[in-house]
């Protein structure tokens, strides 16, 4: 296992009517603080047509953040790859890898929302084929001088990226996956499976075994870097943490439920419409410094995840609460975790 790493997930999702210019400045403050506190990576998610929330574009945001830090890796977590053409994505990420001096992580997933598929003219039955062909094409574009490849929905004729990425052979490819077949696909075509934030620990433990079997079948070793994302909030006590974050986490998961995220999750652990006290059971990192440290240690031991991407702010949450959690994580939780694992 690689040494333990911690990433900051900036969803950057805010209620309609909020001043996004002001919210952007707050996100910059969080990123600068994360860099100072020893976080390893910065993740920005991606959704189009994100009503009832508003958010900044992933590529634009991460490109801007490349100038705010010299250390944080820049994780596209995730690109809805089935909606796009491979040459476009290959060029965008290679360019940012050059600008950031080799800090890009290519996170990719299928997507699940009908509004996004329809807007990009993609039929649901096409999603998996588009995804796998795009991954293959992007790898080739990053590693070959000229690429000729006829996909089902694109054609490359002696095509090349205008600039190659700094990282060799290419930036790491993290494949986001919820269902077992998608995890098996991640083992075949990605550098690692990027574990979702929604499922209970027992589900993730079971799916890690699915992933290991798929790696064995593909003749691949378990990855040195194994990332997973989790919701996280730290306060003086668990009761206080739950009281403070309840309204904001509740709102976020109501939106997930309305968007249909449940449909992408495995049977038996696919109801994000649960009452809050049931939703948080064995699912999020919430509590005091000692409790959250122990939760992360336990999760690491049971799953093997060693790059924990933590989301610490949800729609409507004041900036001060997010900054307080980041401070507690960096100064108190992370040292305890590194000592305890």
How would you name each of these model-derived features?
Residues 2-22, 82-149, 153, 193, ...:
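Flexible, glycine-rich active-site loops centered on histidine and acidic residues
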Residues 6-10, 42-44, 74-76, 104-108, ...:
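Hydrophobic faces of well-ordered beta-strands that scaffold small-molecule active sites
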Residues 41-65, 80, 197-201, 311-322:
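Glycine-rich, proline-tolerant flexible connector loops at the mouths of alpha/beta enzymes
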Residues 34, 38, 65, 96, ...:
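Conserved, mostly hydrophobic/aromatic
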Residues 2, 36, 125-161, 200-306, ...:
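An alpha-helical appendage that flanks or caps ligand/catalytic pockets
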Residues 10-25, 79-87, 167-178, 233-235, ...:
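Active-site mouth loops of central-metabolism enzymes
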């Amino acid at each position: 296992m690689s040494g333990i790493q911690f990433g900051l997930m900036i969803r950057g999702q805010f209620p309609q009517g909020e001043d996004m210019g002001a919210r952007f400045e707050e996100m910059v403050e969080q990123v600068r603080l994360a860099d100072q506190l020893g976080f390893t990576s910065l993740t920005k998610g991606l959704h189009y047509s994100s009503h009832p929330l508003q958010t900044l574009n992933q590529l634009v945001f991460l490109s801007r953040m490349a100038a705010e830090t010299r250390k944080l890796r820049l994780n596209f977590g995730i690109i809805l790859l089935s909606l796009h053409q491979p040459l476009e994505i290959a060029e965008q990420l290679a360019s940012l890898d050059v600008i950031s001096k080799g800090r890009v992580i290519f996170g990719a997933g299928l997507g699940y929302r009908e509004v996004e598929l329809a807007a990009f003219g993609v039929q649901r039955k096409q999603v998996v084929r588009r995804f796998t062909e795009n991954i293959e094409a992007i790898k080739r574009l990053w590693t070959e001088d000229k690429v000729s490849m006829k996909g089902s929905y694109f054609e490359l004729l002696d095509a090349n990226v205008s600039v190659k990425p700094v990282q060799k052979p290419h930036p790491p490819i993290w494949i986001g996956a919820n269902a077992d077949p998608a995890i098996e696909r991640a083992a075949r075509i990605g550098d690692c499976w990027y574990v979702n934030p929604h499922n209970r620990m027992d589900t993730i433990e079971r799916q890690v075994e699915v992933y290991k079997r798929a790696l064995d079948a593909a003749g691949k070793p378990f990855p040195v870097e194994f990332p997973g994302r989790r919701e996280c909030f730290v306060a003086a006590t668990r009761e206080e943490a739950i009281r403070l974050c309840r309204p904001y986490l509740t709102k976020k998961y109501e939106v997930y439920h309305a968007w249909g995220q449940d449909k992408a999750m495995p049977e038996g652990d696919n109801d994000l419409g649960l009452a809050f006290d049931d939703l948080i059971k064995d699912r999020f990192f919430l509590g005091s410094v000692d409790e959250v440290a122990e939760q992360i240690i336990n999760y690491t031991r049971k799953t093997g995840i060693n790059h924990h991407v933590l989301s610490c702010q949800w729609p409507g949450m004041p900036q001060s609460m997010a900054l307080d959690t980041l401070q507690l994580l960096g100064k108190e939780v992370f040292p305890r975790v590194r000592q305890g694992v």
